[in-house]
A protein has these predicted regions:
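Short, well-ordered coil/turn elements that cap or connect secondary structure elements
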Residues: 38-41, 123
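Conserved helicase ATPase core of P-loop NTP-dependent helicases/translocases
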Residues: 21-23, 40-85
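A conserved SF2-helicase RecA2
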Residues: 105-200
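Cofactor-binding loop segments of dinucleotide-utilizing enzymes, especially the Rossmann-like FAD-
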Residues: 25, 48, 103, 131-133
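Alpha-helical elements of Rossmann-like donor-binding domains used by nucleotide-donor carbohydrate transfer enzymes
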Residues: 5-9, 32, 36, 63, ...
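Conserved helicase/translocase motor-coupling segment
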Residues: 1-39
Length: 200
């Protein structure tokens, strides 16, 4: 459901002429979305396995980023992980929409990823979507664990560096909707887990 929602949202934004960066920690997600699911939006993708290369050499980081940043390009989506698109890449003039399909525990790279489209002084409206799987009330999952740890780490970094702006720069998720689905119960979760660990 998260990948389907992500692709639908990217298409919706593209119809409005808006580019989107999709963040994922997982290489398979990055490749499948970039190669197959969003081919119609001429998506490009980068991760650690993609050569840095040069502009003009197809399927290199530099060329894919240039294609995405080009306002006249029909490339409407960049799919990436934090590490491959962390430092020195500025996207705020080309893109104002980010979707976090999933996240990792690395607070520094998470903040840098937000900074790709949210530069100080740039007043354009930004839309950042952080997706979490729907769960029954009272059940914890890895996405909530990551969310809580990121908040704690950002708070600690802010205190350690004596930089209250650091905490303000991070997206305040307390205003977002909690992904609670009252229709999912413990038996549904047990069935999903059984399917995942079933020998193939």
């Amino acid at each position: 459901p998260k990948i389907k929602w992500t692709c639908n949202k990217a298409r919706e934004l593209a119809k409005e002429g808006k580019k989107t960066i999709i963040w994922s920690y997982f290489r398979n997600n990055i490749e499948h979305i970039g190669k197959y699911y969003l081919r119609d939006l001429n998506a490009v993708y980068i991760h650690g396995g993609i050569e840095t290369g040069e502009v003009g050499i197809e399927n290199t980081r530099k060329d894919n980023i240039k294609r995405f940043k080009d306002k006249d390009s029909d490339c409407m989506v960049l799919v990436a992980n934090y590490a491959s698109c962390a430092e020195g890449i500025s996207l705020q003039h080309a893109c104002h929409n980010a979707i976090y399909l999933d996240r990792s525990f690395q607070a520094d790279l998470y903040l840098q990823s937000e900074d790709r489209i949210c530069r100080l002084g740039n007043e354009d409206q930004k839309n950042i979507y952080i997706l979490q799987s729907e769960i029954p009330r009272g059940v914890r999952n890895i996405e909530l664990t990551i969310k809580n740890n990121l908040e704690r780490k950002i708070d600690n970094m802010s205190k350690f560096l004596n930089d209250p702006d650091l905490k303000q720069m991070a997206i305040d998720e307390s205003e977002g909707e909690m992904p609670i689905d009252e229709n999912i119960n413990m038996q549904d979760i047990k069935s999903m887990l059984d399917d995942l660990i079933k020998p193939r």
